[in-house]
Amino acid sequence: MKVKPSVKKICDKCKVIRRHGRVMIICENLRHKQRQG
């Protein structure tokens, strides 16, 4: 999980979701997991 001030999709399989008011990226490739914070 990378925590970044701005999150972006890295590949076509990345999805932007919101959990508990946080923007997150989830993907099949676990290296692409990100959270805004």
Curated annotation (Swiss-Prot):
TM helices/strands, residue ranges: none
Keyword Ribosomal protein: yes
Protein name stated in the entry: Large ribosomal subunit protein bL36B
Pfam families: Ribosomal_L36 (PF00444)
InterPro entries according to UniProt: Ribosomal_bL36, Ribosomal_bL36_sp
Gene (UniProt): rpmJ2
UniProt organism field: Kineococcus radiotolerans (strain ATCC BAA-149 / DSM 14245 / SRS30216)
Record's keyword terms, sorted: Ribonucleoprotein, Ribosomal protein
Domain of life: Bacteria
